[in-house]
Amino acid sequence: MEPAFGEVNQLGGVFVNGRPLPNAIRLRIVELAQLGIRPCDISRQLRVSHGCVSKILARYNETGSILPGAIGGSKPRVTTPTVVKHIRTYKQRDPGIFAWEIRDRLLADGVCDKYNVPSVSSISRILRNKIGNLAQQGHYDSYKQHQPAPQPALPYNHIYSYPSPITAAAAKVPTPPGVPAIPGSVAMPRTWPSSHSVTDILGIRSITDQVSDSSPYHSPKVEEWSSLGRNNFPAAAPHAVNGLEKGALEQEAKYGQAPNGLPAVSSFVSASSMAPYPTPAQVSPYMTYSAAPSGYVAGHGWQHAGGTPLSPHNCDIPASLAFKGMQAAREGSHSVTASAL
């Protein structure tokens, strides 16, 4: 006769899937095991699967109870405030301690037993979430206590002000002799724009204002740059040219140039003072053709009606230019007349 509910296992026993084994069968399994019967023989005798028998016996050996565990319930909380306090104490005593070492200490000190001791992953999570933030806060507080008070920042602008590392670097750079030293507060300050004008956005106005206020030298503003000229600069000393000694310049100009074969600049003659070369006889490029007149082409189709062969567009050719070496080339060449052609 088939049961009204449940399923039949391979041994012929009846079980309900998802439900624990009845307590009577559990007690019988434990009694047979105490009599020395092997789990496989208990499985065949009670028609219960071998895995179920082994699990029940293992739970009884660990907890001493034959009752099943909570189905669908949560595990009891093992990370109690007492456990967290002891974990924090272990971590403060030895910052390099591992999670598994903390677990062993909890068992050794009797804080937890083997049933409610937190796992290694739980201890790591406690160290990361609960104790890690407190440790970082403690380090930060101790750092603030040992940290000296910050120096007041120089106000570079009336709205925003913050320290600039460039001023400290500029203060370390030595100033060469003869050059006026620029105050450290003026050396490349970082400024926030106080308005939407171009000079304030670029920081030009603030730099020039600070230079004019702190430096004894006059620094013109952007509006005055267009009015500056060469007359505004002080004249150099008569014995110095651009800050250099005149005697040194004359000596360098006197002995610094090596003599070469080129004539001096003053020996060249301008082209206007030279007489133009005689104009050679113009030879027509169109030769006499002995064929019928119909085959003779008087000129090109693109030639201007009033133009000449040398100036087809009726343009005047300027006088010949004076070039060096043209006379020698002209004397060495023989003129060719039209009759020879």
Swiss-Prot record:
Source taxon at top rank = Eukaryota
Please give the residue ranges the record annotates as the region RED subdomain: 82-130
Which controlled-vocabulary keywords does the entry list? Developmental protein, DNA-binding, Nucleus, Paired box, Transcription, Transcription regulation
Any one of the GO CC terms: nucleus
Presence of the UniProt keyword Transcription regulation in the record: yes
Q: Spell out the Pfam families in the cross-references.
A: PAX (PF00292)
Q: Write down the SMART domains for this protein, in alphabetical order.
A: PAX (SM00351)
Q: How does it assemble?
A: Interacts with KDM5B.
Name the record gives this protein = Paired box protein Pax-9
